[in-house]
């Protein structure tokens, strides 16, 4: 699952995240964030819940708003993408500089994340200090041919992303 974390702790806290769900697992709300990090506005309440908070699998930048993800099971893209996850980052509104506005890729091995998120589809944000953006990715799905569709509610478009045999340089 993807999680958009709380606001009000600064530009870089707490991280949004992507993680698997454990039955009966506690992920911190509202007493802790990203593992056993106490929410300072709760003044140490419920330390027993803070201690049992599960640390998520993958940190994403704070306030980037991960809205959707899709696991890649196709064969159109290079083999390195198979089994990994594409995650849409809708973008920020409450940071001193904009961030997000892209699709990232998280590699997987043996059903678990095996690396950090890396940029896959970018270009919606003109510059971090500029308040103007070209679009905001929302959803991502894989089509039967292995290409991806990415919805964009800022640009009011649906983008088809396919692989043509060469890597971008």
List PLM regions with ranges:
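Blade-level signature of beta-propeller repeat domains, shared across WD40, Kelch, NHL, RCC1
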Residues: 141-169
């Amino acid at each position: 699952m993807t999680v958009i974390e709380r606001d009000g702790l600064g530009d870089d806290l707490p991280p949004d995240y992507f993680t698997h769900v454990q039955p009966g697992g506690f992920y911190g709300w509202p007493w802790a964030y990203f593992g056993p990090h106490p929410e300072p506005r709760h003044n140490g309440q419920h330390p027993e819940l803070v201690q049992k908070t599960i640390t998520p699998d993958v940190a994403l930048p704070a306030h980037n708003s991960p809205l959707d993800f899709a696991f890649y099971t196709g064969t159109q893209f290079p083999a390195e993408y198979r089994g990994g996850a594409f995650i849409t980052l809708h973008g920020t509104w409450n940071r001193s500089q904009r961030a997000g506005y892209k699709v990232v890729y998280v590699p997987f091995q043996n059903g678990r994340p095996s690396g950090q998120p890396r940029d896959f589809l970018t270009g919606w944000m003109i510059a971090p200090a500029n308040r103007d953006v070209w679009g905001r990715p929302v959803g991502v799905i894989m089509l039967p041919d292995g290409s991806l569709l990415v919805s964009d509610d800022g640009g009011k478009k649906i983008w088809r992303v396919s692989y043509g045999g060469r890597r971008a340089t």
